[in-house]
């Protein structure tokens, strides 16, 4: 890679959004997106809103969530914010109830995530519990709440998309809980698909590093720890095994949700969209 690393979250432009013709992409239908205040969640909110679906953007960050709503409106879409703590069942229930008032819930994008880097023997159990709650238990709970809404919709068709990772395929040191929950999300994905009778689909998305705040804020600390430049962290550490030496953007990941939710993916039932620049499947 050339030049200095830009640690700012990329700007999302309408021309970057994948727009698809789809009978379910209309204002009468609703998509719930978690982690919508920034990164992939924000981008997915904007992408689904730009495709004509009403979006309930859920996040604990109220300022970021409201900013996402305004961005969606600038793209000509409709979004509404719901503040939710994904460790609280009653708040998730309230969020789904709010979404149901907007229209027929058809889509759920489980994207919210946090990170903690530590070896197993040093890993704080409180942090384990928090990551497990936000990144695996909450997606299960939300799917449990959303599936009945999809079933009772006019045609009973809908989909749940889960944001996995290359860490749902391979593990790396000092990320034990991230590895665990991402592998678990693939199990949840396949379980939903198995019970969906071909009408309620589920899929996961596995990418390498994406230029989200979660990933970008790791770069300076990793550079300091390793005694290398931020550029070297991205090129040699984050993208060391990737055939493409640049980070994927949030909207590129969001477009995978658009595709996965669309009629073009009607045979994507329990499958995983692995878009990782060759990290998992190739080597030298």
What are these regions (language model features)?
Residues 121, 170-177, 216, 245, ...:
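Active-site loop immediately N-terminal to the catalytic Tyr-X3-Lys motif
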Residues 197-201, 268-270:
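Short, small/polar-rich loop/turn modules that mediate ligand/substrate recognition or access, typified
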Residues 165:
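Residue(s) in the substrate-gating loop at a strand-loop-helix junction
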Residues 2-21, 25, 170, 258, ...:
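Short C-terminal tail/terminal secondary-structure segment
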Residues 53-67:
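Conserved glycine-rich Rossmann-like NAD(P)H-binding loop of the short-chain dehydrogenase/reductase
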Residues 119-120, 124-132, 238:
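Substrate-binding pocket helix/loop in short-chain dehydrogenase/reductase
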Residues 143, 181:
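Active-site helix of classical SDR
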């Amino acid at each position: 890679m050339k030049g200095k690393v830009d640690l700012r979250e990329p700007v999302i432009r309408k021309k970057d959004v994948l727009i698809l013709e789809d009978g379910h992409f209309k204002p009468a239908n609703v998509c719930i997106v978690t982690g919508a205040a920034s990164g992939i969640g924000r981008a997915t909110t904007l992408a689904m809103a730009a495709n004509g679906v009403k979006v309930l953007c859920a996040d604990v960050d109220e300022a970021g969530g409201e900013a996402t709503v305004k961005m969606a409106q600038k793209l000509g879409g409709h979004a509404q914010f719901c503040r939710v703590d994904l460790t609280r069942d009653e708040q998730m229930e309230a969020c789904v109830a709010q979404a149901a008032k907007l229209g027929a819930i058809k889509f759920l994008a489980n994207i919210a995530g946090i990170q903690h880097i530590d070896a197993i023997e040093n890993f704080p159990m409180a942090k384990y519990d928090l990551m497990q709650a936000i990144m695996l238990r909450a997606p299960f709970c939300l799917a449990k709440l959303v599936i009945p809404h999809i079933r009772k919709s006019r045609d009973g068709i809908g989909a749940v998309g889960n944001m996995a990772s290359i860490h749902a395929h391979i593990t790396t040191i000092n990320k034990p809980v991230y590895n665990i929950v991402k592998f678990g999300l693939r199990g949840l994905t396949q379980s939903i698909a198995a019970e969906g009778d071909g009408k309620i689909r589920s899929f996961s998305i596995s990418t390498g590093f994406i230029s989200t705040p979660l990933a970008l804020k790791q770069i300076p600390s990793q550079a300091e720890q390793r005694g290398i430049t931020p550029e070297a962290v991205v090129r040699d550490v984050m993208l060391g095994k990737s055939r493409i030496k640049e980070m994927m953007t949030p909207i590129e990941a969001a477009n995978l949700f658009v595709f996965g939710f669309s009629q073009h993916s009607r045979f994507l039932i329990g499958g995983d969209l692995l878009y990782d620049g060759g990290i998992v499947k190739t080597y030298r």
